[in-house]
């Protein structure tokens, strides 16, 4: 349904552009666990608040997850565009009253709903907003009961904000030109959604 797909895109990005929900074929999908960052950081030494300058690139291979706008500033890229993005808020909780063993997702393109996606991951439940929620507990209870048919108490409810939750594309030729420039001139290899400024879903990483 093009109308519904376009409404959803407008709701989450402010633009009409392709989204992964266009594909309605049966597929195995992947959603990051709540502790995804801590899992992949396990065993690594992480130094916070470190400054990085162009002069520090010494030709050794570097895998960078630094967001493209920041990396353009570091290397002095002359043709820096606007990087459109929108913040999102994710409400996580645990279903308390039932043993749930299904994974299901519902999209909400209607602008009257403050949330845009709900995901059931076993007993974990995620409700995602494109605006700061002010009654998340009530929203969770309503969505679970009315849309998923699960009338249950929830526990461990908390909300996380992600500043660059939804990014919008920039000129693809410029994007690729900059990524190639980083590799050619500094031996820097960009990894991830923000470093490549491309909408990447976890399915792409697994594949």
Report each predicted region and the residues it spans:
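N-terminal FAD cofactor-binding segment of flavoenzymes
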Residues: 1-10
